[in-house]
Swiss-Prot record:
Gene responsible for this protein: mlc-2
Region (Disordered): 1-22
Keywords, in A-Z order: Calcium, Metal-binding, Motor protein, Myosin, Repeat
Top-level taxonomy: Eukaryota, Metazoa, Ecdysozoa, Nematoda, Chromadorea
Note: This chain binds calcium.
Signal peptide: none
Pfam families for the chain: EF-hand_6
Skewed-composition ranges (Basic residues): 1-13
This protein's name: Myosin regulatory light chain 2
Native source species: Caenorhabditis elegans
Length: 170
């Protein structure tokens, strides 16, 4: 196969990435897509991503949002969204997925997010929000918070290693 043919075939998206997910995971992706599709038109566009960041008190530079949009070959509908994430998540573990999600809110790229941002993320009404009692239970587990900042890598490790039970019972 020529270099050009290899390059062309490697860029082709088959959609088979979606087949690797079970129904529960696909439902979770649908919920995430619904959160990101701020204007509810079935397509995630630049405006949706800007609004999503704004809803979390963040301002994302146009260059960052443009780079996210360019990862897709066209409009990002649910199928394209699932395919993009399927390619990214193949072989990843839940901890890496959670770290990646929190990293979107890491303005300084330092491995930490503001405690207030963590609470906003966890109580976001568009996903499966934690209520006040669940947030209080989380604090009983002594999450890695220092100086108003959360070490989200340590937090992700804590909740993915079975420690979420410790968070609630501590």
């Amino acid at each position: 196969m020529s270099k050009a043919a290899k390059k062309k075939s490697s860029k082709k998206r088959s959609g088979s990435e979606a087949a690797q997910f079970d129904q529960k995971t696909i439902q979770e992706f649908k919920e995430a897509f619904g959160i990101m599709d701020q204007n509810k038109d079935g397509i995630i566009d630049k405006s949706d991503l800007k609004d999503l960041y704004a809803s979390m008190g963040q301002i994302a530079p146009d260059s960052q949002i443009d780079a996210m949009i360019k990862e897709a070959s066209g409009p990002i509908n649910f199928t394209v969204f699932l395919t993009l994430f399927g390619e990214r998540l193949t072989g990843t573990d839940p901890e890496a997925t959670i770290v990646g999600a929190f990293a979107m809110f890491d303005k300084k790229d330092c491995g930490k997010i503001k405690e207030d941002d963590l609470i906003k993320i966890l109580q976001n009404k568009r996903g499966e929000p934690l209520d006040e009692d669940e947030v209080k239970a989380m604090y009983k587990g002594k999450p890695p918070i220092e100086g108003g900042e959360v070490d989200y890598k340590a937090f992700a490790h804590l909740i993915t290693t079975g420690a979420q039970d410790e968070l609630a019972s501590a």
